[in-house]
A protein has these predicted regions:
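Metal-dependent phosphohydrolase cores
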Residues: 1-187
Length: 187
């Protein structure tokens, strides 16, 4: 694609088989905070790729594992499927679902699998065993928090606008002959 930097081309080449996969594309239909899961994992993946490349770690595994870390196809806030975890257990259970989905469609190496399993650490108790897994875990928390607070700020601004008294809202222009600049000259 024209106009992209070389590292962006490399990132897309590394992850193309995942982000273009039909089953993975279904993540576009499920909400994260104020974006789709697809957009969220793309952001986490790219952030992790850049960090690991800078640190001279396995940036390919980081990018691929990060892309698959939330590969679950349900709305965790609102579903009635008995086999899926209740909202309060989603944080602990969804890595297991993501790993099962990832293994069904892709071949994973040890780092990628560790990234998916441990990205919710410390909630999942067992710490990551690879530096790349730590980076993805922190990138996920940072970007999910940013999404949440951006949404919160956006909603808070809307509430404040609704509460603003009429005296503080902008007035419509009125036809005051003493303030009009394009009026006819007095005779």
């Amino acid at each position: 694609m024209e106009g992209r930097k070389p590292f962006e081309d490399e990132f897309y080449d590394i992850t193309k088989d995942i982000y273009t996969h039909d089953e993975f594309m279904k993540l576009k239909l499920h909400q994260h905070h104020n974006s789709s899961i697809y957009d969220h994992v793309m952001d986490v993946s790219y952030f992790s790729y850049r960090a690991c490349k800078f640190l001279k770690l396995d940036y390919q595994s980081a990018a691929r594992g990060a892309l698959l870390h939330d590969f679950f196809l349900y709305d965790w806030r609102n579903h009635d499927v008995p086999d899926l975890p209740a909202e309060k257990f989603h944080g602990i259970e969804h890595p297991k679902i993501a790993i099962a989905n990832a293994k069904k469609h892709f071949i994973l190496n040890d780092i990628e699998e560790d990234i998916i399993r441990k990205h919710m650490w410390p909630l999942t108790l067992v710490p990551p065993k690879h530096k790349e897994s730590f980076i993805v875990s922190f990138a996920d928390k940072y970007l999910a928090s940013k999404e949440f607070f951006d949404k919160f700020k956006q909603n808070n601004v809307r509430r404040q606008i609704k509460k603003t008294p009429k005296a503080h809202k902008p007035h419509k222009k009125h036809n005051d002959p003493h303030t009009q600049h394009d009026r006819e000259p007095r005779v």
